[in-house]
Regions:
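C-terminal substrate-recognition "lid" of short-chain dehydrogenase/reductases
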Residues: 4, 136, 223-254, 259
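Short, small/polar-rich loop/turn modules that mediate ligand/substrate recognition or access, typified
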Residues: 176, 181, 247-249
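Rossmann-fold cofactor-recognition segment
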Residues: 53-70
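Conserved glycine-rich cofactor-binding loop
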Residues: 9, 16-17
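Substrate-binding pocket helix/loop in short-chain dehydrogenase/reductase
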Residues: 100-113, 139, 217
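Alpha-helical segment proximal to the catalytic Tyr-Lys
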Residues: 129, 173-174, 245
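Catalytic loop of short-chain dehydrogenase/reductase
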Residues: 140-164, 168-177, 189-190
Length: 262
């Protein structure tokens, strides 16, 4: 199986921790040059320095930018690609706090839509010229299993994640002729700060201990455990590899079998 990414440049968003950091490590382990993007520059410097180097010519770096600041994000990534075109883009943004859909303020929907779909669009438009010039590109969006089955009390997240999935499916058709694939990875319950946030929110809302909430969640997972970030990253790395050249426009759950829909 051809997994070698030597000579490819990957931009991984939300890479300071969790799934994003694990994805950066996985892609670097396959030989890619990796640029990590997130808000906290000090952390990014450490992450980039710790990434694997499997051959001598690998160059890793970082870009400090905030998905909530569209103009700043565009400027930062445009400066990056002017120096080093990107062939692999991993869109990965932390989810919003929980709450019901009907109680969320309209402004909240707009804010999260900008942070997720609009930021993704800015990134795609910045990297597309380099991908088209190479005749090769991979766009992988880290979303959620809520794309297939809405998750209770994550109303805004469910709505915006679904929009991102539809956007990605449209892009897959538009960009396929250029040798560019667009796919979505749908993580299930994964050991990240996001999971800790969800447990804390549900505990506060119900009065139940977070440990009991976690047990209830695990009861819905046939694998009987939470995922590790590296397991989600493995799916991302595969979709970014040459081996996945004919995989385009899919939603890939990485959830231990929890999602019941086909």
């Amino acid at each position: 199986m051809q997994l070698n990414l030597a000579g490819r440049h990957a931009l991984v968003c939300g890479a300071s921790e969790g799934i994003g950091r694990a994805a950066a490590e996985a892609l670097a382990g396959l030989g890619a040059d990796v640029t990590v993007l997130a808000r906290r520059e000090g952390v990014l410097v450490e992450v980039a320095a710790a990434l694997p180097r499997v051959h001598g010519s690998q160059r890793h770096g970082h870009v400090a930018a905030d998905s909530r600041d569209g103009d700043g994000l565009r400027a930062a990534v445009s400066a990056l690609v002017a120096q080093r075109p990107v062939q692999i883009l991993v869109n990965n943004t932390a989810g919003p706090p929980g709450g019901t859909a009907h109680e969320a303020q309209p402004e909240r929907y707009v804010e999260v839509f900008r942070q997720h779909l609009v930021a993704n669009q800015i990134l795609v438009q910045a990297v597309l010229p380099g991908m088209k010039a190479a005749g090769w590109g991979r766009i992988v969006n880290v979303i959620s299993t809520s794309v297939k089955e809405p998750i209770p009390n994550l109303g805004v997240s469910n709505t915006v994640r679904g929009a991102v999935a539809s956007w990605a499916k449209t892009l897959a058709s538009e960009l396929g002729p250029f040798g560019i694939t667009v796919n979505n990875v749908l993580p299930g319950y994964t050991r990240t700060r996001r999971l800790e946030q969800i447990l804390a929110e549900r505990s506060a809302a119900t009065g139940k201990p977070a440990e009991d909430i976690a047990k209830g969640m695990l009861a819905t997972v046939p694998a009987g455990r939470f995922a590790e970030p590296a397991e989600v990253a493995a799916a991302i790395a595969f979709l970014a590899s040459p081996a996945a050249a004919y995989v385009n426009g899919i939603n890939l759950p990485v959830d231990g079998g929890r999602t019941r829909s086909l």
